[in-house]
């Protein structure tokens, strides 16, 4: 259950990270409220997941999901670079997440 909650927390991290772009420095109300809510949910779920997972593993997986998810969103939605080096780097992060899961 902790792993499932951690993945959901990571997905909410993607929501708030992407949401920051839409807040325009927190000058737009609705995107700002959505972003703030996503931050609260992400942190709350991360804290809950940490009750059943080692702190280092949980934090590394959470940031990995957020980083890769946000970068993939940027490639798909904002047309950011999808170079070989960038994709390889994402694959290494994902491999690290899988390694942490398998070693827990």
Curated annotation (Swiss-Prot):
Question: Biological process GO terms, please?
Answer: monoatomic ion transport
InterPro entries linked to this entry: Small_drug/metabolite_transptr, Small_multidrug_res
Q: How does it sit in the membrane?
A: Multi-pass membrane protein
What does the record give under GO molecular function? Answer: transmembrane transporter activity
Side Cytoplasmic, residues? 1, 49-54, 101-104
Cysteines joined through disulfide linkages: none
Q: Which Pfam families match?
A: Multi_Drug_Res (PF00893)
Name this polypeptide is given: Guanidinium exporter
Write the gene name: gdx
